[in-house]
Amino acid sequence: GHEFEYTRNDVKGAHIVLCGDSTKKEDVQRLMNGQLADMVFTDPPYNVAYVGGTDDEMTIKNDAMSEEQYISFMDAFFARYRECVSDNAALYICHASAWQMDTEASMRRAGIEPRVQIVWVKNTFAWGFGRYKFRHEPIFYAHIKGHPDNWYGDNTQNTVWEENKPSANRLHPTMKPVEIVERALA
């Protein structure tokens, strides 16, 4: 991995990274610079008040909101999301099972239509206080309502993605493996 330093409103590198607020129109417009994305893989906050199990106990901003605040946040997030993608964009949205109905409702209010639920099956479960330990994460595959989606896969793709989770979360408390993004692009 690479380490980068960013300050608010920085846009750096070939991968277009913005340190900003994905719910603010001006930040998203600065990031996209008039362009529209044909494919997006995103991992918005799950609103589960996550605290990492490492010594530094990493947390995630906007991950402990009230129901009303979270729905408002997700509505703003998906409204901005819709503005920066082409009508035929392929969309992948990681989300928490606990907020699935609200996430889907926010997507639909923004004109984003879920097509299928992908399940990322990890090689090990996540420790927590729940009765059942999560060994998977759901990912919506979606498109813009009323438009066909760009499809990057072949006809052998399926809805179960078995990929190892990163062995350490040094950059983000709930890191996703590069391999699941690669699968979305394949």
Enumerate the predicted regions with their spans.
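Core catalytic lobe of class I
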Residues: 1-186
